């Protein structure tokens, strides 16, 4: 071939390539023509006319990766149902997502950082990566490719309208129906597509349909067959390598993350635990570079907004104690800011049809635990329930007075605590359920019960109801999590801090050792108060009795329907429920701390029997007719529940009862007794009592506890009136049912079954002696026990079906026990 021919052919090929390139670029330009361009983390084109969002992804690398980001999904618009839990602002995700080219498509792949190799060997890291699954959660066609820059244009809309937070599964799992995503009714909200230098934010309306919606959906949705929520997608720039990880330590109340390092030395641990925390650094002059800043939802009304701001600011003292004065602050969210914008750590004020839980959470880097965004959800109806509780205690005439016993002021004090508590979770702090027992409430990360005190003159003192400010434990944990270790290895610096905590007398009790009524740490409980759980229960019972005896018209606001008394009496009648649980932890309980080899911390000890016996006496006091009775004049004020069509809270806050429309005292007593028996007869507690009796002559053991209980409940020699005798019969019958359930229950320890069987036979013998004086009750109890013994496999029955306990906690859910002032985010 001559040079001329070769050169001519080269010109022709080059011209063709240029033409193709120009055509490709023209196609790319044509595809984005007229669309709104948003520059930032990812080049974005918004098509308002067709409700589309297009992404121009960077040129793929040699592995086909066109971008890697932190990905999180939320709901901008929720369902508004606490039992279902599809609330606005609760984050899902926090994974690293990679957009990868595969042929003519781009896939979104969630990387697996739970298993990794930190070794330098590429082959070793690759071996781990290919040993565990990843997750492709979306794919989209490549619309155009920019020949000049290599950028890929993809329609991101179907990613944004996916069921990213698992709405259908959640609705089905909560018994609300089999819902399916309706694609033609799920559209991107192009007016809520935002792109910033380090994050992108997108909203989309997503609709789920069914032909059989459940109760909660019917209550909260205008057309229950079509549930439309607003899904939110966040993409965040991967953090740089400057973040310093911090080791997690189970002796401090931290929120951690875990991964498995397959390249760990053979003599080392493959499981690596890191603490989650914000990046907090100082410049060369020792000043904080980028303070942690939280924002209060501007949708929260005053005076609630001010209380949230004030409580949130308490953490500033903890950061100052950690060596970072000015390292933390709180402001009100500016107008016009999307509450899910990743640039802002937001305390969201969220409404539901019924009262519910609050949460503190975070979006973090799964590689390091670095918190990139704090997210707090506060349920708005909680404050109203708190007011109801305090109106039952103090009287409604105190509302709005501004005095120490003003229910509104008391509820706002609780809101300050709630703000600090949930922000604490977002900062990386876990619960310390032992903090209520020392240093006048050592932490905002405990669950605070109101410290209302009974005076000798029959009045109530509300001046100590809630603490103010951050606690001593919080300052110590702030040093542990955020303080500078000055070049010391984490393990060494943390060991020094643990010694400091021990010298001070700090106590940490974790969620698993506190939350359930059956747990065994004597000072680990929720919604308790006071340094001595037993003395606090005595005080709580006095407060309850004082308020119950004067309960009536003074507990109503002007013009309020008398029906309201039936809901206000519930938290008052059950006012002792959580302090009862706290006191019961001493029965069969232990005192212990979390220990590491060589740290010199003390070994566990069993609670002395004299304290256990006092706890037993107090529990039995809560089951006495005197404790369960209500004055006749109080009962007469409890007007029948009226009809309230459409009120989702109506009825659920009152005692159920076969005696309606009259107030059913026996049903209320059944509910209270159920709580006492839950505490006394928790199977785990019975196992510990039996073991302690076997191990030491100083502890009489389970048999003694059951015998003492039987003697107390079956004591009909006190000359009680007809109502109180009926209450005694009720409680004794409920006790028999519990013993039957324990004796023939499948999951009960054999040693416990033997003891409860003996107690059941003893109860029958006591009933035999009552035949002459109380034939009807005695005969019925004997027959019930005899029938259970004859069948030998009677299904466990905790209490009669009517003995439902009204919700105490926001609503009581799988997250934990029922309580009136609940908040958890670690949860």
Residue spans of the language-model regions?
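Bacterial N-terminal signal peptides
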Residues: 10-21
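Auxiliary tRNA-acceptor-end handling modules of aminoacyl-tRNA synthetases
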Residues: 26-300, 318, 333-385, 390-407, ...
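Zn2+-dependent metallopeptidase catalytic core
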Residues: 62, 301-327
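Soluble non-cytosolic domains of exported or imported proteins
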Residues: 65, 298, 302-310, 409-418, ...
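Sec-exported extracytoplasmic/periplasmic mature domains
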Residues: 313-324, 424-425, 429, 450, ...
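The catalytic-center signature of Zn2+-dependent metalloproteases
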Residues: 332-350, 413-468
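Conserved catalytic/binding loops enriched for acidic/polar residues
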Residues: 436, 440-827
